[in-house]
Amino acid sequence: MKVLGLDVGDKKIGVALSDELGLTAQGLTVIYRTSLKKDLEEIKKIIDLHHVTEVVIGYPRNMNGTAGPRAELVKRFARELYKFTGIKPVFWDERLSTVEAEKLLISGDISRRKRKKVIDKLAATLILSGYLNYKSKN
């Protein structure tokens, strides 16, 4: 049972994938957004290639727990993904995932240029990892 993690942004979608047992998360790729149709096709290819059975999407919340300004866009994307793939996405609180990813990359002495290329993939990995940890404890 592989799980796909997505960090959906305006320009890029970070993608992470779990191992077969659903215990660990690894960054997979970054999709540079062009159109909704092409984005969905790209994700569907990944789902089919890796035999994904579950999809987790980072859900943007404010620090007080309310839905963030991008929440409606993410919900709309999730609805379209469900229609396209038949897999109903699970939302996972992505508060501070990008901030945490940035801190990890800075602490690893990764250059700004390289950080820009991988931050979305790392954020997706953190989102998926949080979800997998929660599932393993419940």
UniProtKB/Swiss-Prot annotation:
Keyword Protease carried by entry: no
GO molecular function, one term: nuclease activity
Subcellular location: Cytoplasm
SMART domains: YqgFc
Coiled coil (UniProt feature): none
UniProt entry keywords in alphabetical sequence: Cytoplasm, Hydrolase, Nuclease, Ribosome biogenesis
Recorded superkingdom: Bacteria
GO biological process terms on file: rRNA 5'-end processing
Alphabetical list of Gene3D superfamilies matching this protein: YqgF/RNase H-like domain
Any Pfam family matching the protein: RuvX
EC number: 3.1.-.-
Keyword Lipid biosynthesis in annotation: no
Enzyme class: hydrolase
GO annotation, cellular component aspect: cytosol
Function: Could be a nuclease involved in processing of the 5'-end of pre-16S rRNA.
HAMAP family: Nuclease_YqgF
Protein family according to the UniProt entry: Belongs to the YqgF nuclease family.
Name the UniProt record assigns to this protein: Putative pre-16S rRNA nuclease
Organism per entry: Carboxydothermus hydrogenoformans (strain ATCC BAA-161 / DSM 6008 / Z-2901)
